[in-house]
From Swiss-Prot:
Protein name: Small ribosomal subunit protein bS18c
Main location: plastid
The species this protein was found in: Calycanthus floridus var. glaucus
Region described as Disordered: 1-23
Similarity comment: Belongs to the bacterial ribosomal protein bS18 family.
Gene it is expressed from: rps18
């Protein structure tokens, strides 16, 4: 086959695997707040394994640690700061509505 008629092929590039967020020396524990807070969203939800890039065992341990910290009041169950902030309300018009 001629080079011009060959089907397009992607060049094989080596990719660099990202390092896991939990090192071998890190202990997954409910008291380790700096580690636990990496795996919680701004709303206070536990992030998924795909987002965290954790193994199944690590994700299970993180989930248990977060739940223990919530029960012991180290972590809030919800983080709804936006709910209590007051925003400027839009003034309502009291006139009759017109249809076009």
């Amino acid at each position: 086959m001629d080079k011009s008629k060959r089907p397009f092929r992607k060049s094989k590039r080596s990719f660099r695997r990202r390092l896991p967020p939990i090192g071998s020396g890190d202990r997954i524990d409910y008291r380790n707040m700096s580690l636990i807070s990496q795996f919680i969203s701004e709303q206070g939800k536990i992030l998924s394994r795909r987002v965290n890039r954790l193994t199944l065992k690590q994700q299970r341990l993180i989930t248990i640690a977060i739940k223990q910290a919530r029960i012991l009041s180290s972590l809030p169950f919800l983080n709804n700061e936006k709910q209590f902030e007051r925003t400027e309300s839009i003034p309502r018009t009291t006139g009759p509505r017109t249809r076009k």
